[in-house]
C-alpha cells in the first residue's frame, strides 16, 4: 500500500507538508493542501475536522489518531471549553506555539503573530521525559523521523518549531509572519474590545481583530507593559555556542555525544584541555542533531589571553559586545575545544551558517537570569477586561540550555492555557490570578524528580503534573495589584539589585536582645556572670557555659573551675566549631584580651541565630544542630571522614590525627596548627609580629575585616585567598592541605605528592596560540571524552609492604562481573591470605550495585525477566516506541544494563540495548544538570558574599574610626553589621549544603565510571590481556574499593545527621 503512487494532489501536498524543512515550505504546502481540499485555513478546530474528513489518506491516519487521542481528554470538553474566547499569541517560539496548540484544542480562536519570517536557530535543547512523551503524542515522529533516536534525548530549536508549527496549522491557528507586536490599544469606548498595535501595516482583518486574552511569548527582550522583571546575577559566566555542519557520514555518526562534563566534580578533562590547547573551560556539552552543537562556559582570562576579547571591561555588555569580540579568534577557540572534546573524530569542522549567513558561533552573557515577578495580569478599560499571561523566556529566562527552558516553558504554556480555561468558565479575575500565581511559585522548583512519575498521565490539569498541589497558596487579596482597572504609566523593564542569598533567619534585632539571650543561656553556672558583650567573656567560663548548655555531654560543669582563661576559651572555640558548626570569628587570644569587641558580638550572634529557639533548661538540647550551623558542621565532618577513609585505603600516615573529632576536656589543647614559616612565599613575616591572628590573612598578609574572615584549623583567611592553587576552587576546612614545599593550599584532588615537584604545566601555559587545524590539537589522553577519571596512577606506598598487589584468576574476575555475588561453594578455593582481596572485590562490586539500589536477584527472577523481555520484543514497532516512553527507575535500569551485558541479551535485542544505553546517558545528564545548577547557585552565592563583605567593611571602618559619632548611630551601625553577619552565615550554610551534594555527585560519577571500566577489563579474554592490562585492572579495582568506602562513609554520616535532626524536632524529644 505504501508503494502505491497516489494521483490525488491533496496527498502530494500532505506529503510535502510532512517533509517540509523550511518555514516557507511548510506554509506553502499547507496552503496547497487546504486549497486542494477546499478548506479555508485558520478556522480553528472546525478546519481540523474538515481536513481530517476530506483527506482520506493512509499516511495521515496515524497522525489523526494521535491528535484525536489528545483532544479526547475530558479537560478539553470536545473542543468547547473555550468557545467564544479570542486569543492573541505573540511569538512563534517553542513555548508560544505550544501554548497556541493548547488554546486551539480548548476551542478558542487563536491568532499568532511572529516578527520573523523563518526559523534559523540550530541550538539543541535537552528534553525532559514528559516533553518527549508530550511531543510524541502530537505526532513528532511523523513530522521528524529522527526525533529522540540518538543516545541522548534532544532536538534542535528549529526542528521543534517546525513540528509545533505544523500541529498548530492543522488545528486551525491563524499565523501572521513578519508582523511585530508593539503594544496594546485599549478599547476607546464601552462595548469595544482590545486590539494590538502592530508593525508594519498589518492586514485589515488582523488590525481590527479584538481579543480578550493576550499570551506573550516574544522572548526575554520584550515584556508587555505592567509586568516587572527582576534580574538575578551571579559570578560572571561567559557562554559560547557553536554549530558545525553535520555531513551525516559514517564516521560522524560513530562519535559519541557528551551529555555534560562539569569542572565542579570532574577536573582532569579540563586540565588536559588546558595543557593541550590553552583553553580554560568550566563545562562543555556536545549534541548531535541537524548540526554538531557545542555549548561551553569559558573563563574570561582565558578569552583575553587567547585574543578572543580585545579588552577587559567591567561592564558585561561592553565586554561581550561585537566591538570587543574577535570573530576569527572566537571561531578558532570553539573549533579547538570541539575538536579536543571529540578527539578529532569529526574531521574538518565547518561552521553552520546563522540567519545572517555568518558562522554560527557566538559568545554571550550566561550571568544574568531574568524572572518576571508575576505571570499574569488583568486590565480593564470601559468595562472590557483583558487577561495577559507570560510564557517562555519573558516569564523566566533560563541560565543553561539543558532542558529547563523548554520543559518549564511547556509547563508554563499548560498553566497559561489552564488559566484561560478558568477565565472562559467565568471565574473572577482575582481568583484566576491567584491560581495562576500559585502555579507560578512551583515553576522554578520543578524537576523530573519532584513531578509526577507517570508522564503518560500529564495533561492540562495542573493536578496531573504537580504532586501536593495547592491552588490556594496565593490568596486573591495578595494579587489585587495585578488587577489594573485604571490607566497607568507604562512600567519599563527593570533590573533590581541582586540579593542572591536567602533571607537571614534569626537575625539579631539589637545588642540588648543578644545580651539578654546570652544571660539566659549562661544563668546558674558558678563563676559566670554575663553583664556585657566584652569583658564578661574574657575568662572563657561564659563561653564554656554556653557550649555546655547546648552540648551538656561534652563537659561537666565542675571541670570549668580550674581552667585557665586561654585554655577554657580555646576548648570552647574548638567544641563550638566541631560539635555545633559555629566557626570562629576571632582567636582565643583576642577573646581573652578583649581586643576585638565587634568580632565577639558577631561571633555570639551566630550562636543566637542558630539556637535562639532552644529552651534554656539544662540538658534540653539534642545532638542536632538547627539552622545554618547544621550544614557547616556536617560538611566539616564529611570532609574529615572522607579524607581519613582515603588515607586508610592508601596506607598513608594520617599525621597523628585522632579518628574522633572530640577533644578531651581534661587535656584541652591551646596549640594552633603549624603556621608557615616567614620565608615561605605566601606568608608575610608581619603576621607573627604586630597583629593578632584574626587581623591578618594567613596567606596574603592583608588586613581582615569581620565579614571577610574565614577560619580553618585555627588560622584566618580571606575567602578569595582560601582557594586551591591549581583549580581555584573554594576550599573548606578538612578538605584541603598546605604543601610543605611551596606553602600553597591545595584541594585534596590536586595536592602534589610529597617529594615530587609540582608540574607547572597543570596550570596551563601563560600564553599559547590556538591551533589552526584539528590535527594539532587532538589529545593523546583518554580514549573517550567521558572517561575523565583516568590519569596518573597512584604510586604504591613503599613503606607499606603488607599491602601487596593481588592478581585475581579469570574465574574470580568473571564472578566479580556477574550479578550473582555469592560464589559457588564447590568452586571456592580454600581460604588463604591472598584471597582477602578477592573478598574485598566482591564486597566492592556488591556495594557498588547496592549503591545504585540494585537488588541481588535470584536466577529464577533473572530468567523470568529475560522471558518477559522476549515477549516484549515480539510486539509491534509502535508498541516498542511507547514502551521506550516509560522512564525506567535509575536503579533498575542499571541492573538491567548489567544483566543484559553479562547474559548476552544485549546483543540479541538491539532495541533494548539502545533504550538502556540512552537511559544510562540520561542518568549521566541528570548528574550534569544538577552539577550545573549547583555551579550556578555557587556563583550567585560568591557574588552575594563579595557584596556583603564590601558593605561590612564600610560599616566596620565607620564603627572603628568614628569615635565621636553619637551612641545611637553606633548602635544602628552595629545592628546593620549583625544583619550582614546573619546573611553571610545563611549563605555559607547554603553553600555547605551544595558542597555536600557535590561530594555525592562526585563519588557517584566516579563509581559509575570505575564500574564501567572494571567491567571492560573483565569482559576481555584472559589470554589476550597484557601485563599492563592486568596492572591497570588491579588499579581500577583498588580505586573502586576506595570510592565504595567513601560513599559508605558519606551514607553513614547522612543517616546520623538525619536522625540527629529528627531528634531535635519538637515533639520528638523526650
UniProtKB/Swiss-Prot annotation:
Residues annotated as binding FAD: 95, 114-116, 121-123, 181, 293, 393
Domain Calponin-homology (CH) as annotated: residue spans: 508-612
PANTHER family xref list: [F-ACTIN]-MONOOXYGENASE MICAL1, CALPONIN HOMOLOGY DOMAIN-CONTAINING PROTEIN DDB_G0272472-RELATED
Domain notes: The bivalent Mical/EHBP Rab binding (bMERB) domain, mediates binding to predominantly Rab8, Rab10, Rab13 and Rab15 (in their GTP-bound forms).
GO MF: actin binding; F-actin monooxygenase activity; FAD binding; metal ion binding; NADPH oxidase H202-forming activity; oxidoreductase activity, acting on paired donors, with incorporation or reduction of molecular oxygen, NAD(P)H as one donor, and incorporation of one atom of oxygen
Feature type site, description Important for interaction with ARHGAP26 AND ARHGAP10: 832
Needed cofactors: FAD
SUPFAM superfamilies the record matches: Calponin-homology domain, CH-domain (SSF47576), FAD/NAD(P)-binding domain (SSF51905), Glucocorticoid receptor-like (DNA-binding domain) (SSF57716)
GO biological process: actin filament depolymerization; sulfur oxidation
Modified residues (Phosphothreonine): 475
Lineage: Eukaryota, Metazoa, Chordata, Craniata, Vertebrata
Segments of skewed composition (Polar residues): 770-781
Record field: catalytic activity: L-methionyl-[F-actin] + NADPH + O2 + H(+) = L-methionyl-(R)-S-oxide-[F-actin] + NADP(+) + H2O; NADPH + O2 + H(+) = H2O2 + NADP(+)
Listed name of the protein: [F-actin]-monooxygenase MICAL1
Amino acid at each position: 500500500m505504501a508503494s502505491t503512487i497516489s494521483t490525488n494532489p491533496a496527498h502530494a501536498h500532505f506529503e510535502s507538508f510532512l517533509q517540509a524543512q523550511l518555514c516557507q515550505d511548510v506554509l506553502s504546502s499547507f496552503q496547497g493542501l487546504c486549497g486542494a481540499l477546499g478548506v479555508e485555513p485558520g478556522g480553528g478546530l472546525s478546519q481540523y475536522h474538515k481536513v481530517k474528513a476530506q483527506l482520506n489518506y493512509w499516511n495521515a491516519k496515524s497522525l489523526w489518531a494521535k491528535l484525536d487521542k489528545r483532544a479526547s481528554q475530558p479537560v478539553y470538553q470536545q473542543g468547547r471549553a473555550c468557545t467564544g474566547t479570542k486569543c492573541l499569541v505573540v511569538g512563534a517560539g517553542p513555548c508560544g506555539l505550544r501554548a497556541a496548540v493548547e488554546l486551539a484544542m480548548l476551542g478558542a480562536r487563536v491568532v499568532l503573530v511572529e516578527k520573523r519570517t523563518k526559523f534559523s536557530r540550530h541550538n539543541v535543547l535537552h528534553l525532559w521525559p514528559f516533553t518527549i512523551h508530550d511531543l510524541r503524542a502530537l505526532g513528532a515522529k511523523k513530522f521528524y523521523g529522527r526525533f529522540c533516536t540518538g543516545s541522548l534525548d534532544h532536538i534542535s530549536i528549529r526542528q521543534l518549531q517546525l513540528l509545533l508549527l505544523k500541529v498548530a496549522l492543522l488545528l486551525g491557528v491563524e499565523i501572521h509572519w513578519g508582523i511585530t507586536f508593539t503594544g496594546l490599544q485599549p478599547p476607546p469606548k464601552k462595548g469595544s474590545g482590545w486590539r494590538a498595535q502592530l508593525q508594519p501595516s498589518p492586514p485589515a482583518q488582523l488590525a481590527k481583530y479584538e481579543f480578550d486574552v493576550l499570551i506573550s511569548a516574544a522572548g526575554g527582550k520584550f515584556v508587555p507593559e505592567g509586568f516587572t522583571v527582576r534580574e538575578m546575577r551571579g559570578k560572571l559566566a561567559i557562554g559560547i555556542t557553536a554549530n558545525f555542519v553535520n555531513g551525516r557520514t559514517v564516521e560522524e555518526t560513530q562519535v559519541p555525544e557528551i551529555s555534560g562534563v562539569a569542572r565542579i566534580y570532574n577536573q582532569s578533562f579540563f586540565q588536559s584541555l588546558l595543557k593541550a590547547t590553552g583553553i580554560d573551560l568550566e563545562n562543555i556539552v556536545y549534541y548531535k542533531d541537524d548540526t554538531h552543537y557545542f555549548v561551553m562556559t569559558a573563563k574570561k582570562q582565558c578569552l583575553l589571553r587567547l585574543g578572543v576579547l580585545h579588552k577587559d571591561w567591567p561592564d558585561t555588555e561592553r565586554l561581550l559586545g561585537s566591538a570587543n569580540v574577535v570573530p576569527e579568534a572566537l571561531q578558532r577557540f570553539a573549533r579547538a575545544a570541539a575538536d579536543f572534546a571529540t578527539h578529532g573524530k569529526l574531521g574538518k569542522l565547518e561552521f553552520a551558517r546563522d540567519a545572517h549567513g555568518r558562522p554560527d558561533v557566538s559568545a554571550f552573557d550566561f550571568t544574568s537570569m531574568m524572572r518576571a515577578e508575576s505571570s499574569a495580569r488583568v486590565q480593564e478599560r470601559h468595562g472590557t477586561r483583558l487577561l495577559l499571561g507570560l510564557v517562555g523566556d519573558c516569564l523566566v529566562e533560563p541560565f543553561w540550555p539543558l532542558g529547563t527552558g523548554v520543559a518549564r516553558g511547556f509547563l508554563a504554556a499548560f498553566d497559561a492555557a489552564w488559566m484561560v480555561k478558568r477565565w472562559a468558565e467565568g471565574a473572577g479575575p482575582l481568583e484566576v490570578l491567584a491560581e495562576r500565581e500559585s502555579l507560578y511559585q512551583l515553576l522554578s522548583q520543578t524537576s523530573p524528580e519532584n513531578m509526577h512519575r507517570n508522564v503518560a498521565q500529564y495533561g492540562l490539569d495542573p493536578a496531573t503534573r504537580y504532586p501536593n498541589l495547592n491552588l490556594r497558596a496565593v490568596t486573591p487579596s495578595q494579587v489585587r495589584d495585578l488587577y489594573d482597572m485604571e490607566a497607568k504609566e507604562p512600567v519599563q523593564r527593570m533590573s533590581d539589585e541582586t540579593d542572591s542569598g536567602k533571607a537571614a533567619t534569626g537575625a539579631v534585632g539589637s545588642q540588648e536582645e543578644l545580651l539578654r539571650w546570652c544571660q539566659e543561656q549562661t544563668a546558674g553556672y558558678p563563676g559566670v556572670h554575663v553583664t556585657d558583650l566584652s569583658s564578661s567573656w574574657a575568662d572563657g567560663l561564659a563561653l564554656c557555659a554556653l557550649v555546655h548548655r547546648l552540648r551538656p555531654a561534652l563537659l561537666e560543669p565542675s571541670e570549668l573551675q580550674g581552667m585557665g582563661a586561654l585554655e577554657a576559651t580555646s576548648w570552647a572555640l574548638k567544641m563550638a566549631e566541631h560539635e555545633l558548626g559555629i566557626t570562629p570569628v576571632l582567636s582565643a587570644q583576642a577573646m581573652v584580651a578583649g581586643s576585638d569587641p565587634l568580632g565577639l558580638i558577631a561571633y555570639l550572634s551566630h550562636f543566637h541565630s542558630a539556637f535562639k529557639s532552644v529552651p534554656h533548661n539544662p540538658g534540653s538540647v539534642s545532638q542536632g544542630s538547627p539552622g545554618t550551623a547544621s550544614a557547616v558542621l556536617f560538611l566539616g565532618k564529611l570532609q574529615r571522614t572522607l579524607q581519613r577513609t582515603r588515607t586508610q585505603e592508601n596506607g598513608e600516615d594520617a599525621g597523628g590525627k585522632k579518628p574522633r573529632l572530640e577533644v578531651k576536656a581534661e587535656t584541652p589543647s591551646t596549640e594552633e596548627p603549624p603556621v608557615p614559616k616567614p620565608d615561605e612565599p605566601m606568608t608575610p613575616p608581619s603576621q607573627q609580629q604586630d597583629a593578632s591572628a584574626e587581623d591578618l590573612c594567613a596567606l596574603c598578609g592583608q588586613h581582615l575585616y569581620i565579614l571577610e574572615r574565614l577560619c580553618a584549623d585555627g588560622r584566618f583567611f580571606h575567602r578569595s585567598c582560601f582557594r586551591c592553587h591549581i583549580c581555584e576552587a573554594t576550599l573548606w576546612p578538612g578538605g584541603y592541605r598546605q604543601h610543605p614545599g611551596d606553602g600553597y593550599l591545595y584541594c585534596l584532588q590536586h595536592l602534589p605528592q610529597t617529594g615530587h615537584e609540582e608540574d607547572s604545566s597543570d596550570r596551563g601555559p601563560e600564553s599559547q596560540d590556538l591551533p589552526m587545524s584539528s590535527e594539532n590539537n587532538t589529545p593523546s589522553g583518554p580514549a573517550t571524552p567521558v572517561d575523565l577519571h583516568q590519569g596518573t596512577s597512584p604510586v604504591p606506598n613503599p613503606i607499606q609492604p603488607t599491602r601487596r598487589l593481588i592478581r585475581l584468576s579469570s574465574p574470580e574476575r568473571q564472578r566479580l562481573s556477574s550479578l550473582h555475588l555469592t560464589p559457588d561453594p564447590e568452586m571456592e578455593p580454600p581460604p588463604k591470605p591472598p584471597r582477602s582481596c578477592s573478598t574485598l572485590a566482591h564486597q566492592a562490586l556488591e556495594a557498588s550495585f547496592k549503591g545504585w539500589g540494585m537488588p541481588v536477584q535470584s536466577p529464577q527472577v533473572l530468567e523470568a525477566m529475560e522471558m518477559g523481555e522476549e515477549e516484549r520484543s515480539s510486539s509491534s514497532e509502535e508498541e516498542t516506541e511507547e514502551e521506550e516512553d516509560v522512564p525506567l527507575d535509575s536503579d533498575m535500569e542499571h541492573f538491567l544494563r548489567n544483566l543484559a551485558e553479562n547474559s548476552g541479551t544485549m546483543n540479541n535485542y538491539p532495541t533494548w540495548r539502545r533504550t538502556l544505553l540512552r537511559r544510562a546517558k540520561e542518568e549521566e545528564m541528570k548528574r550534569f544538570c544538577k552539577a550545573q545548577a549547583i555551579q550556578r547557585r555557587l556563583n550567585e552565592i560568591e557574588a552575594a558574599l563579595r557584596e556583603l563583605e564590601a558593605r561590612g567593611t564600610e560599616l566596620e571602618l565607620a564603627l572603628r574610626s568614628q569615635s565621636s559619632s553619637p551612641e545611637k548611630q553606633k548602635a544602628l551601625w552595629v545592628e546593620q553589621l549583625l544583619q550582614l553577619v546573619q546573611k553571610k552565615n545563611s549563605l555559607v550554610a547554603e553553600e555547605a549544603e551544595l558542597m555536600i551534594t557535590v561530594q555525592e555527585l562526585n563519588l557517584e560519577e566516579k563509581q559509575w565510571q570505575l564500574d564501567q571500566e572494571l567491567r571492560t577489563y573483565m569482559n576481555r579474554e584472559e589470554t589476550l590481556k597484557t601485563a599492563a592490562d592486568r596492572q591497570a585492572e588491579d588499579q581500577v579495582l583498588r580505586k573502586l574499593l576506595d570510592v565504595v568506602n567513601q560513599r559508605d562513609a558519606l551514607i553513614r554520616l547522612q543517616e546520623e545527621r538525619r536522625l540527629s535532626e529528627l531528634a531535635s524536632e519538637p515533639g520528638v524529644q523526650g
